[in-house]
Amino acid sequence: MTKNCLNQENCIPIFSENSSGDFFSCNPWLLFFNRNKINYQIFSLKKNDTLLFNSSSRLYIILIGSLIITKVLRNTHKVTLNLLTTGDTFGQIELVDDNFYYEAEAIDKTEVACINYTTIIKACSNCAPFNLFFVNHLVFCSAKAYHFIEIISHKSITSRLASLLLLLAEQNGTQVNNGIMLNFTITHKILAQIIGSNRVSVTRILANLLKTKLISIQKKRIIVHSPVLLSQRILNQ
C-alpha cells in the first residue's frame, strides 16, 4: 500500500525520497508535516466507523484504507458522492448549512490524518514545492472524482456494479493466481449504497457474475478473474 501512495502522479521527489521502512515514515504528507513541525492528528477507523462534519475547515488525508463520502440531507436521504482510497483527501475550507452535512464511512480499516486548512494554505504560500504538490494532488483527485461520477451515472445497475468492481480491483486489489482479489471484505449493502441501488439487485447481479465465473468469493473477498471480460459486460449493457 505504501507503493500505491508513493507512485501516484501527484507525488514529487522531495516528498517521497524514502521508499523503504514503515509506511508512516515515508508518507509524503507526513514527511513534510514532520520536517516542518506542523501539527496534525491521526484517526484510526474500524470498518463501518463514520466521521461526521458539517462545519469544518480541515483537510482529511487517507493514509491507508478506504472511505465512502456521503451527503446527508435534512430528510435523512443520502447521496453517495465519492469512493476514496489511500492517498486521497477530502474536506473543505468551511461549510455552514443546516440543510445537509457530510459523512465519511470506512469500508475497511482506515488511518486518516487531519490538519487545519489554514495550515495547508500557509504551507502552500511558504513552500513552492509543496504548493506544486498540492495543486497536482487536487488535479489528480478531480480526475478520480470525475471517473467515479461516470461509474454511478450508468443507466444499467449491472454496468455500475461491474465498473465499481473494476475500480476496487485497480485501487484496492492484490494480484493472486486466478485474478485480482480485493484487499477487504465488502457487503452487498455497501455495494448497493455506493452505486445507488438496493441489496436485492446487487445480490442478483453478483450471483450472475459468479455463475459466469467472472468473479468468485474466497475468504469472503471478491476476486475479479478477468478485468477484460468483466469490462465487456459493461459495454454490452
From Swiss-Prot:
- Residues covered by the HTH crp-type domain: 155-228
**Residue ranges of DNA binding:** 188-207
Statement: the UniProt record of this protein carries the keyword Transcription regulation: yes
What are the record keywords, sorted?
Answer: Chloroplast, DNA-binding, Plastid, Transcription, Transcription regulation
Cellular component terms (Gene Ontology): chloroplast
Where the protein is mainly located, per its record? plastid
Under Gene Ontology molecular function, one entry of this record is: DNA binding
- InterPro entries for this protein: cNMP-bd_dom, cNMP-bd_dom_sf, HTH_CRP, RmlC-like_jellyroll, Tscrpt_reg_HTH_Crp-type_CS, WH-like_DNA-bd_sf, WH_DNA-bd_sf
State its location(s): Plastid, Chloroplast
Q: Which Pfam families match?
A: cNMP_binding (PF00027), HTH_Crp_2 (PF13545)
Query: PROSITE patterns, per this entry?
Result: CNMP_BINDING_3 (PS50042), HTH_CRP_1 (PS00042), HTH_CRP_2 (PS51063)
User: What superkingdom does the record give?
Assistant: Eukaryota
| UniProt name for this protein | Putative HTH-type transcriptional regulator ycf28
Query: Organism, per UniProt?
Result: Pyropia yezoensis
Q: What gene name does this entry carry?
A: ycf28
